[in-house]
Regions:
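A ligand-binding cleft/hinge motif common to bilobed small-molecule-binding domains
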Residues: 101-103, 263-280
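Mature extracytoplasmic/periplasmic domains
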Residues: 292, 297, 301-367
Length: 395
């Protein structure tokens, strides 16, 4: 299932333990979970459900440490690594994926492999491309999945009865309706995924970028991407002179009628915001005919975490049927499962299958038949830097 890892950060003290011993060591530990804290539903799920449940079930005190950018946390761990601080680190668990995982792996900042030791890992389909590889980087047991995502476009059907069906149609719509479209500034993850969709649009084939990196070919497609983004900038909200800082700000722009579309990595987010009263019940979502980018998000344990056992217990609980069902509830978060529902017994399968479907949430079939892979993290990093240099500073 999980391939060998060249450089390991296995703690003999932890690695030699049975799972029962891990549970015993974890009891009484405090686990500090560093994660992006900008989405209220995620924060409510973690603090209102996960925190009390791991305390009740395992005696683990879990503390969410919200951050604006997990890259800053990675930088802190790197400094500790360079300073030789191999034990007693401040960070026990991280919500990461993509370029941050690549950075951690490249610099040997993660404990593990540990994912294959979690009892609930048997519920995960490790052969699924977005689980086996994180933005093109082999996971190799150094991360444990806890959710899946797919980009969707959000719109108010009362204002836009027939939304664009392709990226080309959306670009035409933007030019014809100046000031009515915005996307968050990269490296915000929703702004970044919009840029990657443009990249796929101008290059013509998402699958072609899954292989070996071609510098010349990338430069050609990237330059076309920046030119197109600069071309539409004057037609954006506030003439492209400023960009929303995050998806929450963009959601409020849509709710306030300042723009006509929003972007989300969570297909059920619009339904949740209708439930919470931010969006009217006429809001809906769509995906492009050519597809939208999907991925998996993970948790990882730093090499010098002070509470490795507790972090493993939390990671295992996050992929339990109970925790995954709660997270998938559109009235809680609506984040899609990281586990393979078909691996559950019929009772649990029925619970997942009878979850209420939010009014604005697309069917599983619609989403799954319109999935595009993430490009390798090398492309993501370069596109984000290029956007800043050529689009933002090139205004």
């Amino acid at each position: 299932m999980l391939t060998a890892v060249a450089a390991l950060n296995l703690s003999p003290r932890v690695n030699a333990l049975t799972w029962l011993q891990v549970l015993e060591r974890a009891r009484g530990q405090t686990v500090d979970w560093f994660m992006w804290g900008g989405f209220p539903s995620t924060n409510a799920y973690v603090n209102g459900y996960v925190v009390p449940r791991v305390k009740e079930l395992y005696g683990v005190k879990l503390r969410q440490v919200p951050v604006k950018d997990i890259a800053e946390v990675i930088s802190k761990i790197l400094v500790e690594k360079q300073a030789g601080k191999n034990e007693g680190g401040e960070i026990d668990l991280m919500w990461i994926n993509g370029e941050n995982f690549r950075t951690c792996k490249k610099n040997d900042l993660l404990y593990g492999p540990f994912a294959d030791r979690l009892p609930n890992q048997k519920l995960v389909d490790w052969t699924r491309p977005s689980v086996h590889n994180d933005f093109g980087e082999p996971v190799q047991g150094l991360e444990s999945p806890w959710g899946s995502a797919q980009a969707v476009m959000i719109y108010d059907s009362r204002r836009i009865p027939q939304p664009p069906q392709t990226m080309a149609e959306l670009l035409d719509w933007i030019r014809q309706h100046p000031g009515r479209f915005a996307y968050p500034a990269p490296p915000d993850f929703t702004g970044s995924v919009f840029v990657r969709h443009i990249f796929y649009h101008v290059s013509g084939d998402a699958a072609a970028w899954q292989g070996e990196f071609d510098e010349k070919r990338f430069d050609d497609a990237a330059n076309k991407t920046y030119l197109l983004l600069k071309d539409i900038a004057p037609s954006l909200w506030r003439q492209g002179m400023t960009y929303p800082e995050n998806p929450i700000r963009l959601a409020h722009l849509l709710a306030d009628g300042e723009v006509d579309f929003a972007i989300s990595y969570h297909p059920a987010e619009a339904s949740k915001m209708i439930h919470d009263g931010l969006y009217p019940d006429t809001v809906r979502t769509f995906v492009f005919k050519e597809g939208t980018i999907s991925n998996t998000h993970f948790v990882a344990i730093p090499f010098n975490a002070a509470a490795k056992e507790g972090a493993m217990v939390v990671a295992d609980f996050l992929i339990s049927p109970e925790a995954q069902l709660k997270k998938a509830d559109p009235e809680v978060w609506g984040d899609f499962p990281a586990i393979d529902i078909q691996r559950l017994d019929k009772t649990w399968q029925e619970k997942f299958n009878t979850l209420p479907r939010g009014i604005a949430t697309l069917s599983d079939k619609e989403l799954q038949t319109h999935q595009l892979p993430e490009p390798p993290s090398e492309i993501l990093i370069r596109l984000e830097k290029g956007w800043d240099e050529h689009v933002l500073k090139g205004r």
